[in-house]
């Protein structure tokens, strides 16, 4: 049984940055460090940081006064940021810079008097943060749609002054169809020069298509609450290749491997490589050969830490 590894896979620059911010804050200031929401959607990562002294909370009212709080990579609403400022909390913002870019687009549309449509999944923290970045004091509204049916039912106040943005971790194919539906219904709709789906999401989706075409089974390493990991599993399945989303190697069921001669492995943008290697070891214990890494898009993007934290790290070294 062959093992084929997607390339690229696993951590993206935004996830790397967010995890580094928490780790460096723990190094410099010591525990506890409070983190609003899971810093990234991966159980292994969150548990590892919790063991170091990170305390994960869902809302700021769970945070005592005079502590350090880190905002997760998914971003937060203006209301959350303003509450933190009102309380005088010391904040390090681990919001992915590509999510921040969408926040700025939303605010710019609001200030122009344009209403905004956000394409995204209801309840996802990135969506909640982005919705909360639209400033309704300028007279407009922001609307959420997930699919073409939502677009068909969408009614807006100002169709001639309308724009759209997207969640960064969506399926490119699904999003393209929703954008087409928006443009068909609202021909004057404005949008970003380039869609908001991030480079890492695009690269991993391109890679899993190629991987699935060469595999009898695809395993996606990632947590169930990871949006981009779920999209990878869905994309593999759409090619006709069975696919499973697994958090750990222990979740692999031997019966999945019946009559499988080539198994593909990829990982969501929040899944560490150590989990991929554990999956490889588990498969090899079940008779698989050494893995073959497929060619793919090289990634060399990095994002820097917040300046204050960066300076404190340098001073402590």
Curated annotation (Swiss-Prot):
UniProt-listed GO biological process terms: dimethylallyl diphosphate biosynthetic process; isopentenyl diphosphate biosynthetic process, methylerythritol 4-phosphate pathway; terpenoid biosynthetic process
EC numbers for this chain: 1.17.7.4
Binding site for [4Fe-4S] cluster: 12, 96, 198
Pathway in which the depicted protein is active: Isoprenoid biosynthesis; dimethylallyl diphosphate biosynthesis; dimethylallyl diphosphate from (2E)-4-hydroxy-3-methylbutenyl diphosphate: step 1/1; Isoprenoid biosynthesis; isopentenyl diphosphate biosynthesis via DXP pathway; isopentenyl diphosphate from 1-deoxy-D-xylulose 5-phosphate: step 6/6
Keywords: 4Fe-4S, Iron, Iron-sulfur, Isoprene biosynthesis, Metal-binding, Oxidoreductase
Catalytic center residues: 126
GO-annotated molecular function: 4 iron, 4 sulfur cluster binding; 4-hydroxy-3-methylbut-2-enyl diphosphate reductase activity; metal ion binding
Residues that hold (2E)-4-hydroxy-3-methylbut-2-enyl diphosphate according to the record: 41, 74, 124, 168, 226-228, 270
Binding residue positions for isopentenyl diphosphate: 41, 74, 124, 226-228, 270
NCBIfam families the UniProt entry points to: ispH_lytB, PRK01045.1-2, PRK01045.1-4
Role noted for this protein: Catalyzes the conversion of 1-hydroxy-2-methyl-2-(E)-butenyl 4-diphosphate (HMBPP) into a mixture of isopentenyl diphosphate (IPP) and dimethylallyl diphosphate (DMAPP). Acts in the terminal step of the DOXP/MEP pathway for isoprenoid precursor biosynthesis.
Family: Belongs to the IspH family.
The protein, known as: 4-hydroxy-3-methylbut-2-enyl diphosphate reductase
Organism: Chromohalobacter salexigens (strain ATCC BAA-138 / DSM 3043 / CIP 106854 / NCIMB 13768 / 1H11)
The gene coding this protein: ispH
């Amino acid at each position: 049984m062959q093992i084929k590894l997607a390339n690229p896979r696993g951590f993206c620059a935004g996830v790397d940055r967010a995890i580094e911010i928490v780790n460096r804050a723990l190094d410099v200031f010591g525990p506890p460090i409070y983190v609003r929401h899971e810093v990234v959607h991966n159980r292994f990562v969150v548990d590892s940081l919790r063991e170091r002294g990170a305390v994960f909370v869902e809302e700021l009212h769970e945070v005592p006064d005079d502590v350090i709080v880190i905002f997760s990579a998914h971003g937060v609403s203006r209301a959350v940021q303003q509450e933190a400022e009102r309380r005088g909390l010391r904040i390090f913002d681990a919001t992915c810079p590509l999510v921040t870019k969408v926040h700025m687009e939303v605010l710019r549309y609001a200030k122009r008097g344009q209403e905004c449509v956000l394409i995204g999944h209801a309840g996802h923290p990135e969506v909640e943060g982005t919705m909360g970045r639209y400033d309704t004091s300028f007279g407009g509204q922001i609307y959420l749609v997930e699919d073409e049916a939502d677009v068909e039912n969408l009614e807006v106040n100002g169709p001639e002054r309308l724009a759209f943005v997207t969640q960064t971790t969506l399926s490119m194919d699904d999003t393209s169809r929703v954008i087409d539906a928006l443009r068909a219904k609202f021909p004057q709709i404005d949008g970003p020069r380039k869609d908001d789906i991030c480079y890492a999401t695009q690269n991993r989706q391109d890679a899993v298509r190629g991987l699935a075409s060469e595999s009898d089974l695809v395993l996606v390493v990632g947590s169930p609450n990871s949006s981009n990991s779920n999209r990878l599993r869905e994309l593999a399945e759409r090619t006709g290749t069975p696919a499973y989303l697994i958090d750990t190697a222990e979740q692999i069921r031997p019966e999945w491997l019946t009559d499988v001669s080539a198994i593909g492995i990829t990982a969501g943008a929040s899944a560490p490589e150590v989990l991929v290697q554990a999956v490889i070891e588990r498969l090899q214990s079940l008779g698989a050969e050494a893995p073959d890494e497929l060619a793919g898009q090289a990634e060399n993007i990095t994002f820097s830490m917040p300046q204050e934290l960066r300076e404190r790290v340098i001073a402590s070294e």
